[in-house]
Amino acid sequence: MKLTHLDEKDRPKMVDVSDKEQTTRVAVASGIIEMSQDAYDAIVTQKTKKGPVLQTAVIAAIMGSKKTSELIPMCHPINLSGINCDVEELPELPGFKLSVTAKLTGQTGVEMEALTGTSIGLLTIYDMVKAIDKGMVIRNIQLEEKAGGKSGDFKR
């Protein structure tokens, strides 16, 4: 398989998608942050000094998805039609699972937007409670599923 982000002289390029058909594309990504019981309790009881952690993480995830093309050089700037972020409490870890769904009708996929949003949301949680627990671990940031586009559907 030839990498599409390299030209015939192996120089980086952004892929030309102008000839691609516009289709509806959806991607879901997720990741987990593990933390101490003290950090978890501070978040769920909303007793952190920096404010409502999970609500802020949701907003950050949405913002991160929208900024993907500014952070990842070969990503196209796209007009996302929808972004949704869900946070699930995982008291057994303790920690949280954050999931981002990105959607558009366009000529390129939204996997990177979902993955970037997930990463930024989790990093925001870390930032807001690092005073309580610097040993938090962010893990398993992954594409869960995608639909639409030439490469077909994917489900983990």
From Swiss-Prot:
InterPro entries according to UniProt: MoaC, MoaC_bact/euk, MoaC_sf, Mopterin_CF_biosynth-C_dom
GO biological process: Mo-molybdopterin cofactor biosynthetic process
EC code(s) of this entry: 4.6.1.17
Gene3D superfamilies: Molybdopterin cofactor biosynthesis C (MoaC) domain
Cystines in this chain: none
Active site: residue positions: 127
Keywords: Lyase, Molybdenum cofactor biosynthesis
Pathway: Cofactor biosynthesis; molybdopterin biosynthesis
Highest rank taxon of the organism: Bacteria
Residues involved in substrate binding: 74-76, 112-113
Enzyme class of the recorded protein, top EC level: lyase
UniProt-listed HAMAP family: MoaC_B
Record text on subunit structure and interactions: Homohexamer; trimer of dimers.
Protein name per Swiss-Prot or TrEMBL: Cyclic pyranopterin monophosphate synthase
Organism: Sulfurimonas denitrificans (strain ATCC 33889 / DSM 1251) (Thiomicrospira denitrificans (strain ATCC 33889 / DSM 1251))
